[in-house]
């Protein structure tokens, strides 16, 4: 990193050099603004290299004096990031108190912060889900509740994976993210984390996601992991419970709104996933040869079809051949809300005849994770029987009209 002083059109500018390439130079000026100039119009008066401070990283840190023990497992994402205002770069939070910072939480709980990984959520893979699940299992020996801080973009995938892998839970596992980094005045980090920690202190025996209820502060809701989805790119209330009400809400205390599984006496982890599963998003113009390439070597494929669960008729033979080979094709809907029903139209009935399985009202991403879990732990022989069972509340007995829970 370099401090520089330049002259541009008779004006001196001091700051930190961010980038110098392709005929341009970008500086983080002393006033905090990023300024980019044509390199040919700039005279550099001085360059001074400054040594970057190395941030101390500790795998486990403990805070608080409360009786209830809660573990926070950090995996990365916006919630665990801050902006370095010297350079404009995004860096990991060095002080875990920025995530939950508040004397009230520290007086109520004994909080352990465990750094598991530092990954942007889009870079996480099924192997990371397994690694995280095993770390959670280890941490249950120390705490009565688990919070996982995670990037929001793929949080529904990871949380669903842990929901399926934990056959039994003796304490809650609450995933939490944020839409704005912890150093920003508009950050939702602390409120989301406060809600997550309080949800983790209940008798819940499930995996959930804690995020804002609305765009304003004041209320955090808990979504069942296997019924939730990120439905907005940037709003604080980006997550929704699909076709159902959320599990609980936190303002100053926790209030449950629907039935939930209670914590059991012990944990049971089934940590095998078959990674040879993929998702195909049907669209007009999708050709058979492309589908064949996408599903080659796969053991199962989740199809995001139109409406009640349809694809173009000329693609049906591809999936018929796929299922004939002992593989599994699963139909979900791009509509997200509502349920697949392949018995209504002729295309659906042809898909059934081709061996395509209906996922019913399962969220597509959840069906994808469930297929990986089912193949990994039960194999092909038991796949249809297990996949069609309601394992963690991912299948609804009835759909609730959307206007009821928005």
From Swiss-Prot:
**Keywords from the named record:** ATP-binding, Ligase, Nucleotide-binding, Protein biosynthesis
Instruction: Please name the GO terms of the biological process aspect recorded for this protein, alphabetically.
Output: amino acid metabolic process; regulation of translational fidelity; translation
Q: Where is the active site?
A: 78, 152-153, 230
Alphabetical list of InterPro entries matching this protein = AsnA_fam, Asp/glu_Ase-like_sf, Asparaginase/glutaminase-like, Asparaginase/glutaminase_AS1, Asparaginase/glutaminase_AS2, Asparaginase_C, GatD, GatD_N_sf
Top-tier EC class: ligase
Q: Which reaction does it catalyse?
A: L-glutamyl-tRNA(Gln) + L-glutamine + ATP + H2O = L-glutaminyl-tRNA(Gln) + L-glutamate + ADP + phosphate + H(+)
Q: What is its EC number?
A: 6.3.5.-
Q: What region holds the Asparaginase/glutaminase domain?
A: 68-390
GO: which molecular function terms? asparaginase activity; ATP binding; glutaminyl-tRNA synthase (glutamine-hydrolyzing) activity
Task: Provide the function of this protein.
Answer: Allows the formation of correctly charged Gln-tRNA(Gln) through the transamidation of misacylated Glu-tRNA(Gln) in organisms which lack glutaminyl-tRNA synthetase. The reaction takes place in the presence of glutamine and ATP through an activated gamma-phospho-Glu-tRNA(Gln). The GatDE system is specific for glutamate and does not act on aspartate.
**Subunit field text:** Heterodimer of GatD and GatE.
What family is this? Belongs to the asparaginase 1 family. GatD subfamily.
Protein name (Swiss-Prot/TrEMBL): Glutamyl-tRNA(Gln) amidotransferase subunit D
């Amino acid at each position: 990193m370099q401090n520089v002083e330049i002259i541009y059109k008779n004006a001196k500018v001091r700051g930190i050099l961010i980038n110098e390439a392709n005929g341009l130079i970008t500086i983080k000026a002393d006033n905090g603004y990023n300024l980019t100039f044509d390199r040919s119009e700039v005279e550099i008066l001085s360059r001074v290299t400054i040594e970057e401070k190395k941030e101390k990283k500790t795998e486990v840190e403990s805070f608080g004096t409360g009786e209830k023990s809660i573990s926070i497992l950090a995996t990365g994402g916006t919630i665990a990031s801050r902006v370095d205002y010297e350079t404009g770069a995004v860096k990991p939070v060095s002080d875990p108190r920025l995530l939950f910072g508040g004397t009230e939480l520290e007086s109520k709980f004994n909080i352990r912060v465990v750094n598991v990984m530092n990954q942007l959520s889009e870079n996480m893979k099924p192997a990371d889900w397994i690694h995280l699940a095993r770390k959670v299992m280890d941490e249950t020996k120390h705490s009565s509740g688990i919070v996982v801080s995670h990037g929001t973009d793929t949080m529904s995938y990871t949380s669903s994976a842990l929901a399926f892998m934990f056959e039994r839970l003796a304490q809650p596992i609450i995933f939490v993210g944020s839409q704005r980094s912890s150093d920003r005045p508009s950050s939702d980090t602390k409120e989301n984390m406060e809600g997550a920690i309080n949800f983790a202190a209940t008798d819940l025996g499930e995996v959930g996601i804690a995020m804002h209820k609305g765009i304003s502060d004041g209320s955090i809701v808990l979504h069942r992991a296997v019924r939730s989805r990120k439905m907005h790119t940037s709003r604080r209330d980006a997550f929704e419970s699909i076709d159902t009400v959320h599990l609980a809400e936190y303002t100053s205390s926790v209030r449950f709104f629907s039935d939930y599984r209670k914590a059991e006496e012990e944990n049971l982890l089934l940590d095998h996933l078959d990674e040879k599963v993929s998702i195909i998003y049907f669209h007009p113009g999708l050709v058979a040869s492309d589908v064949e390439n996408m599903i080659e070597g796969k053991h199962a494929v989740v199809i995001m079809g139109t409406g009640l669960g349809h694809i173009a008729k000329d693609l049906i033979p591809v999936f018929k051949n796929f299922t004939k080979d002992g593989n599994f094709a699963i139909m979900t809907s791009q509509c997200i809300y509502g349920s697949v029903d392949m018995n209504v139209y002729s295309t659906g009935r042809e898909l059934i005849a081709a061996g395509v399985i209906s996922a019913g009202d399962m969220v597509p991403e959840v069906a994808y994770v469930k297929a990986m879990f089912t193949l990994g732990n039960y194999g092909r022989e038991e796949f249809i029987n297990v996949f069609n069972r309601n394992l963690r509340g991912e299948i609804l007995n009835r759909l609730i009209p959307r206007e009821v829970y928005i």
